[in-house]
């Protein structure tokens, strides 16, 4: 007859499984639009960036994101903005990328 796992062992296994799930979720989030500089979210104006960033839910818990900082870099295809955010509920850091490229007039 096998003994049931000790409480500490079960806790470690659960903790390991949660960390693995967080890493998998973060890896998938980097492939979403805005998750990396290679896949930025295109916007027409810089005024829209902060509102869109704050309106994005946390990838881990679905909570509201709080702006921590931003940085802009000029590229040939427009201005690339990196927005650093943190979740208000779980404090998970998140970086979103936006490309400010004004729409060309006809």
Locations of the language-model features?
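Short linker/helix segments within small regulatory modules
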Residues: 71-82
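Short Cys/His-rich "knuckle" micro-motifs
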Residues: 68-71, 97-99
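Residue-level recognition of well-ordered beta-strand positions that form the cores
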Residues: 84-86, 99
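Coil-to-beta-strand transition motifs
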Residues: 78, 91-93
């Amino acid at each position: 007859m096998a003994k049931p796992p000790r409480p500490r062992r079960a806790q470690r296994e659960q903790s390991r499984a949660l960390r693995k799930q967080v890493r998998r979720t973060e890896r998938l989030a980097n492939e979403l639009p805005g998750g990396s500089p290679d896949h930025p979210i295109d916007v027409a104006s810089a005024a829209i960036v902060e509102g869109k960033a704050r309106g994005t839910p946390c990838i881990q818990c679905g909570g509201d994101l709080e702006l921590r900082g931003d940085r802009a870099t000029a590229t040939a295809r427009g201005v690339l903005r990196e927005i650093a955010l943190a979740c208000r509920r779980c404090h998970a850091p998140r970086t979103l990328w936006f490309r400010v490229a004004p729409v060309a007039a006809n």
